[in-house]
Amino acid sequence: ASGAKGDHGGAGASTXXLLT
């Protein structure tokens, strides 16, 4: 999970908007 990057994962989904 790349949280801050927003690639994929829990926090990443919220940041980036990607719900992977």
Swiss-Prot record:
Keyword annotations of the record: Membrane, Mitochondrion, Mitochondrion inner membrane, Oxidoreductase, Transmembrane, Transmembrane helix
GO CC entries: mitochondrial inner membrane
UniProt note on tissues of expression: Heart specific isoform.
Start and end residues of each stretch annotated as Disordered: 1-20
GO terms of biological process kind: oxidative phosphorylation
Membrane topology value: Single-pass membrane protein
Pathway where this protein functions: Energy metabolism; oxidative phosphorylation
Location(s), subcellular: Mitochondrion inner membrane
Domain of life: Eukaryota
GO molecular function, one term: oxidoreductase activity
Complex and partners: Component of the cytochrome c oxidase (complex IV, CIV), a multisubunit enzyme composed of 14 subunits. The complex is composed of a catalytic core of 3 subunits MT-CO1, MT-CO2 and MT-CO3, encoded in the mitochondrial DNA, and 11 supernumerary subunits COX4I, COX5A, COX5B, COX6A, COX6B, COX6C, COX7A, COX7B, COX7C, COX8 and NDUFA4, which are encoded in the nuclear genome.
Protein purpose: Component of the cytochrome c oxidase, the last enzyme in the mitochondrial electron transport chain which drives oxidative phosphorylation. The respiratory chain contains 3 multisubunit complexes succinate dehydrogenase (complex II, CII), ubiquinol-cytochrome c oxidoreductase (cytochrome b-c1 complex, complex III, CIII) and cytochrome c oxidase (complex IV, CIV), that cooperate to transfer electrons derived from NADH and succinate to molecular oxygen, creating an electrochemical gradient over the inner membrane that drives transmembrane transport and the ATP synthase.
Family per similarity comment: Belongs to the cytochrome c oxidase subunit 6A family.
Protein name: Cytochrome c oxidase subunit 6A2, mitochondrial
